[in-house]
Amino acid sequence: IVSFYGDNPIISENLSKLEKKQFTSTVEILKQYEKEKRILFGGTFSKKKLKISPTILRTKLNETDILQKELFSSLLPVVGINDKESALKQISQTSKPLAIYLFGGNKKIHNHISKVTSSGTICINDVMLPVLIPNLPFGGVGQSGIGKFHGEEGFRNFSNQKSITFKGFLFDSNLRYPPYERVKKFLKFIFQI
């Protein structure tokens, strides 16, 4: 973070400012974590500049509010999970996430988690790739969103595929209209052939 933003991220031109309402709600979260001494890194902010330094928050598993909320800020809540079973249990107890981000080199664990979980995306050892690859569909499933965007999938999801049918006037089968005895006789004849 220091190599990206320097020793004081608040004065960095590379750190975006927040919209005022978003800044205020994010600072409230930050103050609560500061009070509980659960800021692992960062935590500085400037009301004048509407900036919050990149901040890592030590979060508990039962704090579903911050873990499921879209923060749209530089806060990163993290939960330490010791093993694969605990991670799977946590994922299965919550609604389907927009994305699951896995870090580590064990391909067996990656494959297993991919098979037994449901999410919009799984990203391994990165957090940006799913939105940086233009033709890769990205989006949620269930409560995290419906449909995908990016590339061809995005075009399909944001387009209205309209069905148009046309029937001419020259031929109009009376099999479509009551009484349906004629239809039954016709179908019996067809299926006997």
Model segments located where?
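Conserved C-terminal structural/oligomerization subdomain of aldehyde/semialdehyde dehydrogenase
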Residues: 1-2, 52-193
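ALDH superfamily catalytic-core signature
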Residues: 1-62, 124, 186, 191-192
